Amino acid sequence: MNSKQHCNRCGKQVYPTDKVGPLKDSTFFHQGCFKCYICGTRLALKTYCNNRNDINDKEVYCSNHVPIAGPHDLPMASTNGSGKNLENNNHVKNGNWIDAGLSDMKIAHAMKATQVARPYPKISHEGAKYVVDYDTQTRLELLHRKDEDDLYESFQDKRVREAEEFEKENTEEWEKALAEFAKKYEKGQSNMKKDDLIRQLTIKREKKLETLHTKRKERERHQTAELVDRQAKEMLELFKASRSEYSNLQYPSTPPPPVPPSCSKREIYTTTDYFSSIDEVAIHCARNEVASFTDLIRTLSSGARSDVDVARAIYRWITIKNLNTMIFDDSIQNDTPMGLLRGIKYGTESYHVLFKRLCSYAGLHCVVIKGFSKSAGYQPGYSFDDHRFRNTWNAVFLDGSWRFVQCNWGARHLVNAKDGSHEAKTDGNLRYEYDDHYFMTDSEEFIYEFFPSDHAWQLLPRPLSLLQFERIPFVRSLFFKYNLSFIDNKLESTVYTDKSGAASISIRLPPKGDSLIFHYNLKFFDSEENTISGMSLKRFVMQSVTEDVVTFRVHAPSTRPLLLDIFANSVSSGAYLTGQPIKFKSVCKFKVVCESLQVIMVPLPECASGEWGPAKATRLFGLLPISHPDAIINTGRYVEIRFRMTRPLSEFVASLHRNRTDDRALQACTRSALKGDMVYIQIEFPGEGQYGLDIYTRQDDQLINGKQLLTHCCKYLIHSRNC
């Protein structure tokens, strides 16, 4: 008896991992084939419909296209075929006359029902296309698993031998050192206490043990990578042989050479919503473990429309699985779901190796690339002259081009309280937040953080040198997520000031960048110090926004190198008005070098943090500057600043600041007034000098914990002369 079950749509065998059914008519479908016969809409067991007019029609439909006529659509049948009965049925019911027009309507409905019952032209649907036979792939996986068993068994044996040899050598070393100490102690020649000797020997032992573990980890990772590379080639050979049977398959049978992609990532998709169904499958699969890579890939790719979808499913599954925090039982069996990830347990298999392995099971060409990265601990201006900042990532052939994937960085994405519309969710060993930037990253963006040892894998028309890689600005993924760019195309990671200690960094905002808010931090490059002579270094940076450019102008207070860290976040006007703290994430960093300083720099007045000028007031509060559109105001003893409101704001408060002057002494210098939709801020300065003006406002209905609180609106830098 043949126990194999086949998909009613595509006719191929279905397996438990992607099976839907049996349905009411005893049919089965692949998950990818379980779609409406007419429109291709994905169906569920609660939403699919059958053709009730034809029991021989085993197809499934959505509610909009199911070929079934309701009871009211059917013509009323004659009881004996006589004209009398027909007449009675059509015109007289219980002695009441029925409009003859109803008979015409019934005829029309009957014709419609007949048309509905006719088979629709079948849509073109590829279904769940598995190039390689399930049993064939499973057999190869079992052979690969046997090779892994042997490899990990050799790892364990060598670990035991190394541990025994280490303890033996360590014991001999301790015994020798203690014996020599005893001889010297008896002769009175020892200049060290026994406790100090034991402490010294312990430190030496820990260092040797750490070196042993590091070398062992590197060796085992290298051997595992070699094994996975060989197994991936064997799996791809299986796909190559199977693809030769399908003349219409466009995916190359052998990996093409590395060349720049034919199009950008944004030309393939612009929003992650494109992968919503794919991501849901990955989340579901991560919750429900499978016992083989063959089953895992068939489940992940069940609804895939293209090779991009398949790679996306693998990427999301890996980033959902919080591999770095998994806890493995020592008694874990190799043929269990968790046994699939034993390489993670042993520390021999990393994200990039696992990604390559899974890609081979899906028939995708994938390579592991080694090189440098501007990873944790890196600062702008650093040189890659040793083994620090070594990293590994992947390139996978998708949509006709090689595309970069960095699963490790995609999974380690940290989420701040106000970062986007949703917070990270975790469920045991699962995490649902990730960084989409590191999936199919454009080569022009990837080069800012990763430099391959083989220049060809930069995938750039004009590859960069290592020196150029060191010099280009140090940016993070959010820089590209927010679609930012630098005004100066020749800007480098190290910025040099002029003789007055001034240097500027300007960033162009995207067309719809009104919701972006920036922040910065300034500290000394060689330490965590952020003050000089008791003053915050932040007061030596002026941040301003004009039109679509945000500028950070640094005035170095000394020749000591500085580190400028620029942060950003996308915040709605409503969220900002609540006054709740906003969490920022770094978008770029710069080293600021002042080789000579001929002018003594004066710190800015101590105002609220953030940008100077009225641009924020316009973006977030709808205030239009009528009198002073720039951040800096040059005036005499008096000045009046005017705004026009585009939405109702109920109160304005102005606060004046000056270096070496108590703010309380300046309270009487400002007055605020509202007249219609106009806002007036009037200031009388007590003397010449540089002032900072903070302006606060609130909405009528703005309550925070039952209180009406003011929110910072904007600030000006004012130079008063001729007082």
Curated annotation (Swiss-Prot):
Belongs to the transglutaminase-like superfamily. One of its GO terms (cellular component) is cytoplasm. This is Lim and transglutaminase domain protein ltd-1. Cytoskeleton-associated protein. May play a role in hypodermal cell development. InterPro entries: Ig-like_KY, Papain-like_cys_pep_sf, Transglut-like_Superfamily_Mod, Transglutaminase-like, Znf_LIM. The keyword Cytoplasm applies. One of its GO terms (molecular function) is metal ion binding. It is found in: Cytoplasm, Cytoskeleton. Its main location: cytoplasm. Expressed in the Y and U rectal epithelial cells, in marginal cells of the terminal bulb and isthmus of the pharynx (at protein level). Keywords: Cytoplasm, Cytoskeleton, LIM domain, Metal-binding, Zinc. The lineage of its organism: Eukaryota, Metazoa, Ecdysozoa, Nematoda, Chromadorea. Residues 5-72 form the LIM zinc-binding domain. GO terms for biological process: muscle structure development. The keyword Zinc applies. It comes from the Eukaryota.
